[in-house]
Amino acid sequence: VAVDWRLSKAFAAFANFRREDKEGTGYAGVGNFTTALQIPEPLDSTIDSYELGVQWNGKSAFARLSYFVQEYDDELNGLTWDNPYVPFNGATTGRMATAPDNEMEQILLSAGAHFAYDTSIGFNAIFGKLSQDDALLPFTTNAGVSPGALPRASLNGDADVNHFGLTLATHPLDKIRVRGSASYDERKDNTRSITFADGYVESDMFSFPDSITPERYDYERLRGEIEGEYRLYDNVRLFVGARGEELKRTEQDVDKTTEGTG
């Protein structure tokens, strides 16, 4: 469903709503330690998307601002199956979590302008937030190896995901064109650390008593490229360009990588 309101010659407001329902049966790959199998997976989920915004269109420029929300609702919190192989250590069944209910919120801004010499500049920014608070499944279906109660009922996941982009294109002379772009992406995990102090279970068969805290990670990525074109003749053009990328990560074996071509 989409609705548009013309507020004036240059300004307009809009609202969009979309629902996607998925029901039926798919397939899932699961495992019991050293063995693997494919089993039917019931599907029963809904994705609702909402967007509200305003836009402005001028003689040689435009701007658009909107608020976007996407909600994922999975009626199934987990998938349980009978072990078709000879059970080991009491593991007659297995279980794994399905995709958790989650929500994504974004503020989106885009703008652009045209100037002399066939020059145009574009900018876009996305401020995003991801969250989920689905209940955690118990450690295992095998009571004989369970280390006890979970440290908390839900992960309460919370992450910020932002993006900024800039583009430039110009045709200053009849034979020369230049194009360039730059972007910055970042992911920041704000989820409170969760520690399984009494250990964990592997494949519903083995209990490991050591305390474990899953690592969280953040990253920042900066990318840029520029390309120039010179027309020697109608069918002969020379191109020159360069591109580069820098990626910084936390809690990884390699915390920074840099790539460049030209």
What are these regions (language model features)?
Residues A10-A13, E23, S60-L65, Y117-F123, ...:
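Repeated loop/turn-to-beta-strand initiation elements of outer-membrane beta-barrel proteins
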Residues R19-E23, G58-F62, V69-D73, F127-S131, ...:
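Transmembrane beta-strands of outer-membrane beta-barrel pores
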Residues A36-P40, D82, T92-A97, Q106-L108, ...:
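Extracellular loop and loop/strand-boundary signature of outer-membrane beta-barrel proteins
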Residues V1-G58, F62, S66-Q70, A111:
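Post-signal-peptide, soluble extracytosolic/periplasmic N-terminal scaffold domains
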Residues V3-W5, L52-W56, L109-A113, L166-T170, ...:
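Residues on the lipid-exposed face of transmembrane beta-strands in outer-membrane beta-barrel proteins
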Residues T25-P40, L76-N83, D133-N142, P147-S154, ...:
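Outer-membrane beta-barrel translocator domains and adjoining extracellular loop/strand segments
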Residues V1, T46-Y50, N57, D101-I107, ...:
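Residues that define the transmembrane beta-barrel architecture of outer-membrane proteins
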Residues E71-Y72, L79-W81, T92-G94, N102-G112, ...:
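Beta-propeller domains
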